[in-house]
Design a protein with these regions (language model features):
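Conserved donor NDP-sugar-binding/catalytic core segment of glycosyltransferases
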Residues: 98-131
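N-proximal low-complexity "stem/linker" segments adjacent to membrane-targeting elements
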Residues: 1-27
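Short aromatic/hydrophobic "clamp" motif used to bind/position activated sugar donors
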Residues: 86
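Acidic helix N-cap motif at the loop->helix transition within catalytic regions
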Residues: 16-19, 44-52, 94, 98
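A conserved acidic beta->alpha catalytic loop
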Residues: 31, 39-48, 90
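Glycine-rich, basic loop-to-helix element that forms the pyrophosphate-binding segment
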Residues: 65-81
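Conserved nucleotide-sugar donor-binding catalytic segment
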Residues: 7-8, 137-225
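Conserved short acidic donor-positioning loop in nucleotide-sugar-dependent glycosyltransferases
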Residues: 25, 40-41, 45, 68-69
């Protein structure tokens, strides 16, 4: 029985970044794959480029129509995806060779898992490495203290995390009220019901620099993460929320130090 992996990518006017993403999926040697691309109505030539890629690669399916933000676009992709597992890959991110084979092998060995996640390299726009992230979260308690590893690159990286069809059927898609940290709220809901398997392999590369969503929305991402923690773990001053908030503050202060050092190097 074949195990199909769907990749969902949402994009809007990102013609300069998107080819690397598309080619990284096409280059995967794992044959049972599909790439679902949701374009939000681009006007920069992306639509014509998608036509050309779809003609070249039969595993690509795509639509182009207006949407109300990234979460809604991703949910359209999840609804179209037909795989046994789904990965969400940003239009400015890309997979490393052998990623889909490794993910499929992990699910073959552990079919009960709801999520499979691996490492992710975070790079600047010029491709130089900033930090290597490891996937280590396996329980909901880990997510409560997701910032506790301040100063250490340890988390559940979104580009290198895959979700089973069974898990998506249980919890549904992304909350469309979230614009920047929709994946974190999704992790909380998923880990209420399913286990996470982590693999000791770098699966994806996450671009973080000027022009990327993460670069321009860091503070808003953190604000949404705090809101998700409050919604799921109760009002401030409850023990789980305090554990989350203290670890978050430590991480935030560490990020400020890193940003200051980066400015001094310029």
């Amino acid at each position: 029985m074949t195990f199909t992996i769907s990749i969902v990518t949402a994009t809007l006017n990102r013609r300069d970044f998107l080819p690397r993403c598309i080619e990284s999926v096409a280059a995967q040697s794992y044959p049972e794959k599909e790439h679902v691309i949701i374009d939000g109505g681009s006007t920069d030539g992306t639509v014509q480029m998608l036509r050309e890629y779809a003609a070249k690669y039969p595993h690509i399916r795509w639509i182009s129509e207006p949407d109300d933000g990234l979460s809604q676009a991703l949910n359209k992709g999840l609804a179209l995806a037909m795989g046994d597992a789904v990965g969400v890959l940003g239009d400015d991110d890309y997979y490393l060779p052998g990623t889909l084979e490794r993910v499929a092998a992990e699910w073959a060995a552990h079919p009960e898992a709801g999520l499979v996640s691996g490492g992710c390299d975070q790079v600047h726009n010029d491709g130089t490495l900033w930090v290597s992230l490891k996937a280590c979260f396996t329980t909901r308690d880990d997510l409560i203290q997701c910032w506790r590893y301040w100063g250490q690159p340890v988390m559940l990286p979104a580009p290198s995390t895959f979700i089973s069809r069974r898990a998506l059927g249980k919890v549904g898609g992304f909350e469309e009220r979230d614009r920047y940290a929709m994946d974190y709220r999704h992790w909380i809901k998923l880990t209420e019901h399913f286990s996470v398997r982590t693999v000791d392999q770098t699966l994806a590369v996450f671009r973080c620099g000027e022009g990327t969503i993460s670069f321009s929305a860091n503070r808003r991402q953190w604000a949404e993460t705090l809101a998700a923690s409050r919604d799921h773990w109760g009002r401030p001053l409850t023990r789980p929320w305090l554990r989350f908030f203290v670890s978050y503050l430590r991480f935030y202060q560490w990020q400020r130090v890193l940003n200051r050092l980066a400015r001094l190097r310029r």
